[in-house]
Amino acid sequence: EAAAGKLTEGLKSLNIAFYKRNPYGDHKDANEALIADRQALTAEIQEAEQEAGDLRREERREYLKNSTANYIAAFINDIDSSVNTPCIPTGFNKLDIALDGGLYEGLYVIGAISSLGKTTFITQAADQIAKAGNDVLIFSMEMARSELMAKSISRETYQLTLPKGETWKAKTARGITAGKRYQEYRQEEKEVIYKAIREYAAYAKNIFIIEGAGEVGAKQIRETTEKHISITGRRPVVIIDYLQILSPYNERYTDKQNMDKVVLELKRISRDHKLPVIAISSFNRMSYKGEVKEEAFKESGTIEYSSDILIGLQVKGADKDINITEEKKKNPRDIELVILKNRNGATGITLLYSYNTLFNHFSEI
């Protein structure tokens, strides 16, 4: 028994497959079993050899299932099914061209320094996606639902008045929500607000905002996404605002370990349900000056490697010695979008936007 135990430990340490069987029955060893009944011992050993061979063959069959050849049919089926799940345009035409049509299944991470407009950019894209008839599921960790709604309606007032050069009628988010100000508005200003609300209501049915009250982490994002698919039968574009304030995956993990687990889980959600997941990320303090780079993303290791698309926003001229604080005071601001990584397309593409901070609006230049 002791010898068998030592052999077992030795085989385990060498990672050699084995199984245990006692062919001796109640006899103390093989010699005693042979003397007692040669025929029975021989049959027992032959059966053990047969069983070992069967187990080995089964192990081989299981391993060979990993051969890529076994997945060709599934691969072809995925191509066929993609006809019913085409890419989803963001509504920013130049960005869609750079992304080969729009959003596909995968993990998209977009980052920028504080207060540069990353949430506004993504929520404008979300509105444009919803306008086209697609569902959008937004996990908002900081902003309340009412804040996001006010920003969208403010943007609608700007878009309604821009063609005729009447943007003086457009209203900021605060101008929308501050009821006392309505006493001072002209009737035509109020009509713009009411029309903007109607415009927003027409596509708001496709937008689902989950506020970050309580513990919202990767597990809750998966559960909510799966519930949405189960109830509506539609795969949404999932947006997380933002990564670094999601609930920790494990309280005992370091910040980096938690970020690694969260990013990997978001990647799995996109893969398991064949949908785009967009995560907004903050930058580390060391990256507040100079051009945007992959290593700028806070706790960036897994973000950099696991994301399918990595996008950075920066003030135009960030490669030069500019005063970021002064640039942030401008309205509109010239903002550059840089595609830092694209697993299935071109990288290094830079797109220029005009960001109207008053009315939460990005336009491509």
Locate each region found by the language model.
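TOPRIM fold recognition
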Residues: 1-72
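NTP-binding/hydrolysis catalytic cores, primarily Walker-type P-loop NTPases
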Residues: 58-62, 344-365
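Phosphate/oxyanion-binding loops and surfaces in catalytic or ligand/nucleic-acid-binding neighborhoods
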Residues: 14, 37, 48-51, 55, ...
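P-loop NTPase motor core
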Residues: 23, 28-29, 33, 39, ...
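Cytosolic-facing regulatory segments adjacent to core modules
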Residues: 134-233, 297, 350-352
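Short, well-ordered coil/turn elements that cap or connect secondary structure elements
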Residues: 13-15, 202-204, 272, 304-306
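C-terminal anion-handling pockets and recognition modules
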Residues: 339
